[in-house]
Amino acid sequence: MNYMVRDPLRLTTDALLHASGVDGVFARTAVFERVVDGLNVLISRHRAPETEVLRFPPVMSRAHIQKSGYLGSFPNLLGAVCCLHGSESDIRGAVEGDKAKGGWVGALDATDLVLTPAACYPLYPLVAKRGRVPQAGLLFDVASDCFRHEPSAQIDRFQTFRMREFVRIGTPDQVVAFRADWMTRAPEIADLLGLSYKTETASDPFFGRAGKLMAINQVEQSLKFELLIPVRSAQQPTACMSFNYHRDHFGKTWDIKTWDIKTRDIKTSDVKSADPQSEAGALAHTGCVAFGIDRLTLALFAAHGLDLRTWPASARDALAL
């Protein structure tokens, strides 16, 4: 499916988004949000019946993000919640302090909160508290307002954005099958919405020289794919969905283990004679399909224009416009 990509920067800034004075942070108009709502309903229709739905706030535990390994991979993207601490005189002094020394900004101290960088990060410690993953595995629908410190004038790169994910937790076979299924279903959704796309292997923006090696390994092992859709240009399409296989990273980090046939029926009297590896359980594997809600919305307007009434019938029906 081919179409001419219109000027998305002018399109979005003039009619859909209002600049805040900070790159990548926008106020969104009613017509933009109408499409966002339609997308969320469409995504929900593709949710499996056994899926547990969780909605997370835009902040999460600093201790949890440290334990997850995020700082080792993306320290430059993390945003921390900071506040003024101390007595009334301390805080007043900071507010009225010497601007040459940084003023109140220089007096800020970190709290125990950070801005959520991806919708699935708050999920894993919750799952870990529940004990063994059942034999059938687990499915979650999670969403959050997320933040990544990537200031840019490019209209398709928000610093604060909405992410929706379906997360699969279970055995390697279960997670691989889940991702393969979604790599078939996601293009069907794009076709329904009248969007051009291509799917390619990809890597996360790991930090530093060591990060370059991590990115190479991620591509070589086909751990991440992205569905790319023209927003700014057809030559440089934008990643609007991703299909990720984390292997046992989060299982190992949070000690999430499966409860398979070998372990589920072990009686207390049989523990000593049971196979140690079976009793210990296998580390759970995880994977997710992530939807960039704001990017998908921008892609739709870039493809079909501002007037929702002129959009393809299949897209209008799918989004209930």
Regions found by a protein language model. Name each.
Residues N2-L321:
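TRNA-recognition modules of translation machinery and tRNA-sensing kinases, especially anticodon-binding
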